[in-house]
């Protein structure tokens, strides 16, 4: 019998990525205080890559404790802007200020995934994407935030590339799935190796 896969996430886009790839899974959303963990790691000068990995692992571990024998997938995405971690904006004003700072600049998205099985990590990967934002006018950015706030409030950096946010960028260097928050190709390779999916 195949080991079941559990997605430890409430993210609709991550669930959709697995569904689109025909990966059988169930969801169990962990209740974790991400902001406290992030703050503690930042206080220790942890780099953004390590923070993404630690948050993904924390989610997988929490759900793995409830489901022995299952493979539990935890994911997290962070935005590294000039060595500074940007999170989901807490207000339209924050989103606008951060977008103005990133206008005309490069930043990096780091998408971490960790699989736990029987209380132990068995696989992990952090994918990275480098993005360059166009030089955008303040009036365009103000309108963009006003039009898209209900959606972008749930996205690191205040944009979604699968929506109007794609217009903010001049170049994107990296895997599209990592932009969406999951290193899907690497995950599928591991699941095929373990016999969770047919190849």
From Swiss-Prot:
It catalyses: a ribonucleoside 5'-triphosphate + H2O = a ribonucleoside 5'-phosphate + diphosphate + H(+); a 2'-deoxyribonucleoside 5'-triphosphate + H2O = a 2'-deoxyribonucleoside 5'-phosphate + diphosphate + H(+). The active site is at 76 (proton acceptor). It holds the Pfam family Maf. InterPro entries: ITPase-like_fam, Maf-like. It is an enzyme of class 3 (hydrolase). Its EC number is 3.6.1.9. GO terms for cellular component: cytoplasm. Its main location: cytoplasm. This is Nucleoside triphosphate pyrophosphatase. It comes from the Bacteria. Its cofactor is a divalent metal cation. Disulfide bonds: none annotated. Belongs to the Maf family. CDD domains: Maf. GO terms for biological process: nucleotide metabolic process. Keywords: Cytoplasm, Hydrolase, Nucleotide metabolism. GO terms for molecular function: nucleoside triphosphate diphosphatase activity. It is found in: Cytoplasm. Nucleoside triphosphate pyrophosphatase. May have a dual role in cell division arrest and in preventing the incorporation of modified nucleotides into cellular nucleic acids.
């Amino acid at each position: 019998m195949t080991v079941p896969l559990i997605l430890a996430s409430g993210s609709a886009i991550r669930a959709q990525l697995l569904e689109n790839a025909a990966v059988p899974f169930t969801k169990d959303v962990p209740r974790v205080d991400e902001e406290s963990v992030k703050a503690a790691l930042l206080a220790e000068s942890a780099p953004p890559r390590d923070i993404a990995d630690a948050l993904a692992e924390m989610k997988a571990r929490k759900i793995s404790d409830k489901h022995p024998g299952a493979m539990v997938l935890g994911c997290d995405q962070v935005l590294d802007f000039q060595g500074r971690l940007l999170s989901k904006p807490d207000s339209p004003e924050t989103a606008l200020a951060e977008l103005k700072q990133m206008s005309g600049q490069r930043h990096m998205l780091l998408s971490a995934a960790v699989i736990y099985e029987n209380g132990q990590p068995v696989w992990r990967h952090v994918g990275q994407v480098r993005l360059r934002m166009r030089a955008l006018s303040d009036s365009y950015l103000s309108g963009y935030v006003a039009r898209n706030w209900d959606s972008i409030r749930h996205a690191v950096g205040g944009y979604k590339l699968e929506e109007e946010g794609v217009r903010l960028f001049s170049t994107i260097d990296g895997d599209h799935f990592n932009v969406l928050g999951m290193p899907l190709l690497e995950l599928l390779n591991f699941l095929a190796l373990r016999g969770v999916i047919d190849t």
